[in-house]
Amino acid sequence: MANIGIFFGTDTGKTRKIAKMIHKQLGELADAPVNINRTTLDDFMAYPVLLLGTPTLGDGQLPGLEAGCESESWSEFISGLDDASLKGKTVALFGLGDQRGYPDNFVSGMRPLFDALSARGAQMIGSWPNEGYEFSASSALEGDRFVGLVLDQDNQFDQTEARLASWLEEIKRTVL
């Protein structure tokens, strides 16, 4: 087992594709990505470093049944964390959003995931500058940085590889 676990929630498959790209770039440092609806808390907790991906749905929701998805996802998983401690875990988020279609809650689905994990003691890393995006509001901002890597596969797909490479270099410097 590698030291880095990659987990994702998805509705359209775009987040899964990014998770696979991350795995390809990390190679043996990370295990193959797993959809969060296909894992257990024990499997999740087995990794000291977690890279977690989520899209933003509707008005800023995480994927899951309450957001209209056909299967469980992040919404249900974080509800099941209950009193689990993530102390000693290092976590970085990557989020997908559509800044033109949803400018009022761009990548806001990252916020509930960030809050749930940090409240349970996780060391959150991998924030990302908000420069180069055009949106009105996002709850995923802390100052002028997002709580994780932000990718817009709808409008800026041509920037994904460069953003991903830069973010992963920062992650590797922090955890290796």
Curated annotation (Swiss-Prot):
- Keyword vocabulary terms for this entry: Electron transport, Flavoprotein, FMN, Nitrogen fixation, Transport
- What Pfam families does UniProt report for this protein, alphabetically? Flavodoxin_1
Q: Does the keyword Disulfide bond apply?
A: no
What is the top-level taxon of the source organism? Bacteria
SUPFAM superfamilies (alphabetical): Flavoproteins (SSF52218)
Q: What terms describe the molecular function in GO for this protein?
A: electron transfer activity; FMN binding
Record-linked NCBIfam families: flav_long, PRK09267.1-5
Job description of the protein: Low-potential electron donor to a number of redox enzymes. NifF is the electron donor to nitrogenase.
Flavodoxin-like domain location is: 4-172
Essential cofactor(s): FMN
Biological process terms in GO annotation: nitrogen fixation
State what protein this is by name: Flavodoxin
Name the family: Belongs to the flavodoxin family.
Q: Which organism is it from?
A: Klebsiella pneumoniae
